[in-house]
Amino acid sequence: VYGLWYGNNYGSIITYYALTRVLESLNYTYAMIRNPLGREIDIDALNRSHPLKFARDRYEVTPLLPINRLSELNNNFSAFVLGSDQMWNYNLSRPYGQSYFFDFVADDKVKIAYATSFGKDKYIGPEDEKIRTDRNLHRFDGISVRDDFSQRICKDEFGISAELLSDPVFLCPVEKYNELIAEASDFKVEGDYIFAYILDPNEKIGASIQKIAEETQKKVIVVFNESGDKESFKERLKISSELVSYELVPTVNEWLY
């Protein structure tokens, strides 16, 4: 499985957790392909990173291979699955070359994209990259996307009829999420509350949060991504309401709670 399972976005983490639970329910064995632009992780970094701790406890992970050696994985696997999220957003995929389009996967291996996305409502890569993308997309055995604009891009730009399928989080049985929540047994929030998970904090979002808190008279718990300057994020929201509090670095289980 190739994708953003190791990132600091809680939603991405849960997306790949859900995908792997579904694969297991179908009796497939799998491994997660390690970020080829990453580095070996020392124990201190592992203990600081919720995504990596979450992965360590739940996934088989491939050895760290640079992009020019990813083809070695063909020796170990019969099929490759590209996960959900904005894997085909050129702004995100550019550092990875064509690896997000499985250029390293041999012709005789099964290649599947599940609920992938271009992240934009139009293709934004340069023409030479589009030519390579077209060639590699036509090598896939199955392509599905999670949004209608990605489906349209596949059709209009590359002549591919992609299936429109839901994100893996909607395939995974709710019992699997309850198991994760049960592991957050020490994390409790008393009373009713509103949960706000903010990826790109700004004053407009902060004003909306404050308005909702004051109109409902419910407390709001705000969470940001694990990485980044949390104090700077709070300043960008410019929230003054005492009803709003911040849970700065919850575990994956606590976030799901």
Label every model-predicted segment.
Residues 70-71, 94, 115-199:
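A nucleotide-sugar donor-handling region in carbohydrate enzymes
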Residues 107-110, 140-141, 160, 218:
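A short helix->loop->beta-strand "cap" motif at the edges of active sites that frequently abuts
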